[in-house]
């Protein structure tokens, strides 16, 4: 049986429903960006028993990263498959500044979603409270990078207006991490990036547009790219076939 409310009450019911959804959206945004704390990062990477960053992210030693530069996707796949990790490889990338040397690094993640005004307002408010007022949200995660990190961004495959970085932010990424960039989305200013010696980006596309209508909802949180689950502290290893994301304890 269908219920029918009096017409004069309908608008108030809609308002109440909207307010409830807004509250849920704000809480969801802060659950990832504001309160995904050190303890939660340790919990989701509990098999790692080595050194960790201040925020709880696993820190695989440099000597291990160096050895992984010679590992092929097939070799990594065999080990991962044997341990039950069947969804750690993602292919079909475009490479900006391709080179023979493979990118290997400790993953720092960023999660973006299509912009929603109510949630984005609260994210920007929190950013302002933290002093992040002079640059866009895409720069927030770049500020966290350390040498040996590799930034992995889920821009939900957005190409037009999904350009996470141009040559200026690419320079900032390389200056801080001495490493590259992986984006499930796009970049711009490729001609400028070609002048950054040692920098490389793996992207799903390129576009001249500026980043627009997206919001950052998580830094160093679990993300998904294609059929791959990626955690902060994983080790990203590139080769001509694509990118393998290796759990740190393996």
What are these regions (language model features)?
Residues 1-11:
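N-terminal secretory signal peptides that target proteins for export/translocation
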Residues 56, 173, 234-236:
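Buried hydrophobic positions in well-ordered alpha/beta secondary-structure cores of metabolic enzymes
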Residues 15-27:
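Bacterial N-terminal signal peptides
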Residues 32-77, 81:
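N-terminal pre-domain segments of enzymes
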Residues 235, 241-244:
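Channel- or pocket-lining gating/hinge segments that regulate access to a cavity or pore
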Residues 71-75, 80-232, 245-250:
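Feature captures the catalytic cores and cofactor-binding loops of soluble hydro-lyases/lyases
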């Amino acid at each position: 049986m269908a219920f029918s409310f009096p017409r004069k009450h309908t608008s108030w019911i809609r308002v109440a429903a909207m307010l409830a959804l807004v509250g849920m959206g704000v809480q969801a945004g802060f659950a990832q960006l504001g309160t995904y704390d050190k303890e939660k990062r340790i919990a989701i990477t509990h098999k790692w028993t080595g050194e960790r960053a201040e925020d709880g992210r696993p820190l695989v030693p440099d000597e291990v990263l160096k050895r992984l530069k010679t590992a092929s996707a097939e070799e990594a796949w065999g080990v991962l498959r044997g341990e039950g990790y069947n969804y750690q490889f993602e292919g079909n990338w475009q490479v900006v500044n391709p080179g023979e040397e493979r990118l290997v690094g400790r993953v720092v993640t960023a999660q973006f979603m299509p912009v929603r005004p109510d949630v984005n307002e609260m994210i920007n408010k929190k950013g302002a409270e933290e002093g992040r007022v002079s640059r866009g949200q895409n720069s927030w995660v770049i500020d966290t990078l350390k040498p040996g990190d590799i930034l992995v961004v889920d821009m939900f495959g957005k190409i037009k207006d999904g350009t996470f970085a141009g040559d200026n932010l690419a320079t900032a990424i390389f200056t801080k991490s001495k490493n590259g960039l992986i984006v499930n989305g796009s970049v711009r200013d490729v001609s400028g990036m070609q002048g950054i010696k040692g920098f490389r980006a793996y992207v799903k596309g390129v576009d001249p547009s500026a980043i627009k209508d997206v919001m950052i909802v998580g830094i160093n949180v679990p993300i998904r790219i294609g059929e791959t689950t990626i955690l902060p502290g994983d080790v990203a290893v590139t080769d001509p076939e694509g990118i393998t994301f290796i759990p740190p304890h393996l």
